Amino acid sequence: MTHSSLPGYFGPLFAVFLFVLGLCVGSFLNVVIARVPLDQSIVRPRSRCPRCGHVLAWYENIPLLSWLALRARCRGCGVPISVRYPLVELLTGLLFFACLRRFGWTYELVPALVLVSLLVPLAFIDLDHWILPLSMTVPGMLAGIALAFPLGMDAFRDALMGAAVGFLSFRMMEYVGWKVFQREALGAGDKYLVAMLGAFLTWRALLGVLLFASMQGAVVGILMLLATGRAGPRTENTQDEPAGDAPPLTMTWEFTQPGLPLWKRLLLVPVCLLVQPIPDAPLDEEGEEEEWVPERTSIPFGPWLALAGLELLLLGPWLSRVLPADIAMMLGGLP
């Protein structure tokens, strides 16, 4: 049953309710975006102005309306309030409404809303801090698996496979990046985000997620280079003093032991790929990781993964119709 099939005026009424709920969730997601990267509580203290410390009253926290009523300025000190706060609220409300249009009043709406509530803050956190907090991606992955259980064992199995395939494929790319190029090929948190997407969208959608994210990220990256030129790193040029080499990835010392049975060597491969730590940056001469500074033209991959996940979640049936059948099949039939 979709919202349009509800009796009388209840269909539009519930649609408006879900949109307003999305606005309120978006207001909370602004708190998540601001506090989670700093390891601060998202419950206490109450929201306040970061400049003057003015604690916001309840009527200053009404999504969209408070920002407009305050004319985008703090009531305590008059400092401008970023337009991103109402934009996140509006974006979340619109995505909630889009999920309703896509799934109707069915159980599938529940995991869709949960996924939206995870992807929005993760995208903005990665834009701001270049991190994807494990405190969000790992519980999100588990939530995707758990929410698939009421849909039946096939859906539950697909969610498990999606999480496993997403994590292991990106873990392998991460390993190959260090083994072959001696540098980081992917962000450390990307594999957990892809595992979360696999749990919600199933493993069949992962190729589409990777393809859409890579293409859109590449287009924007090229446009940024054309607009700004090839900017160097934000720090001084250090080509004359190259960073220390990354440690050789020999997995574990057991591989070098003579007489080790072949079956043990094969068994150690997946185990070591899963548990061996891979540094996030090259090591200096003392063996400590150097501080990594993104170039001015660099953009994180997390937002593009989140965007691709939302596109497949909301536009899957439409993409299946407009794309050639062989491409749609290659992308797992799309969700």
Swiss-Prot record:
Keywords: Cell inner membrane, Cell membrane, Hydrolase, Membrane, Metal-binding, Methyltransferase, Multifunctional enzyme, Protease, S-adenosyl-L-methionine, Transferase, Transmembrane, Transmembrane helix, Zinc. It is a multi-pass membrane protein. Zn(2+) binds at C49, C52, C74, C77. The gene is pilD. Plays an essential role in type IV pili and type II pseudopili formation by proteolytically removing the leader sequence from substrate proteins and subsequently monomethylating the alpha-amino group of the newly exposed N-terminal phenylalanine. Pfam families: A24_N_bact (PF06750), Peptidase_A24 (PF01478). One of its GO terms (cellular component) is plasma membrane. The chain crosses the membrane at residues 13-33, 105-125, 131-151, 206-226, 258-278, 299-319. The lineage of its organism: Bacteria, Pseudomonadati, Myxococcota, Myxococcia, Myxococcales. GO terms for molecular function: aspartic-type endopeptidase activity; metal ion binding; methyltransferase activity. Belongs to the peptidase A24 family. The keyword Glycoprotein does not apply. GO terms for biological process: methylation; signal peptide processing. It comes from Myxococcus xanthus (strain DK1622). Zinc is required for the N-terminal methylation of the mature pilin, but not for signal peptide cleavage. It is found in: Cell inner membrane. This is Prepilin leader peptidase/N-methyltransferase. InterPro entries: Peptidase_A24A_bac (IPR014032), Prepilin_IV_endopep_pep (IPR000045), Prepilin_pept_A24_N (IPR010627), Prepilin_peptidase/N-MTase (IPR050882). Its cofactor is Zn(2+).
